[in-house]
Swiss-Prot record:
Similarity section: Belongs to the universal ribosomal protein uL1 family.
PROSITE patterns in the record: RIBOSOMAL_L1
Gene encoding the protein: rplA
Subunit annotation: Part of the 50S ribosomal subunit.
Organism (species): Brucella suis (strain ATCC 23445 / NCTC 10510)
Protein name as it appears in the record: Large ribosomal subunit protein uL1
Amino acid sequence: MAKISKRINKIREGVDRNKLYDLSAAIGLVKERAVAKFDETVEIAMNLGVDPRHADQMVRGVVNLPNGTGRTVRVAVFARGDKAEEAKKAGADIVGAEELFEIVNGGKIEFDRCIATPDMMPLVGRLGKVLGPRGMMPNPKVGTVTTDVAAAVAASKGGAVEFRVEKAGIIHAGIGKVSFDNAKLEENIKTFADAVIKAKPSAAKGEYVKRVSISSTMGVGVKVDPSTVKVVD
């Protein structure tokens, strides 16, 4: 326990919990304090002035990060016939219809993102209790219900990140790896923040973006001055 406390204190050193850092400085602090023995993910948290309990204040969408996420994304596609073949050629990890339904319905989730052609949704919709809580239910609003399965697979593999506001009004997302250079992380963060701003619901009143912070997987959060991520209401 003493070793853990010492490590945590070392990570926290030099980070003022009450200060808003400009984005470039915050990225530097996060990278300097990423001491895990693996390539940690850099994550962003945005506190929004919305109440997601109301349907007209839901914030969700998808954004293609210019420098990818650094993750290997496993993609499942529900499709038949030619569309199934297109998905396979595009690099989908798992492709199927009824047989894939049975696998997923049995609780075996060996993928990170799920895509479906429109004709498959009556079947896929029955997996709501399995895919819904994991945020994997295909949705046309984020491009995962589509006839262009090849493009959807390519986007998923190439850096597409879905976002959805949580109950407390917070959006979390991984936007790169500690091994990325600072400029690439900054570009990804600004691209992500811009997408969240553009997804602002018309019913949201007052201050939309309340707080922004970034961290690494095992690190502490560093508060970011929203104006430095081009966040303007």
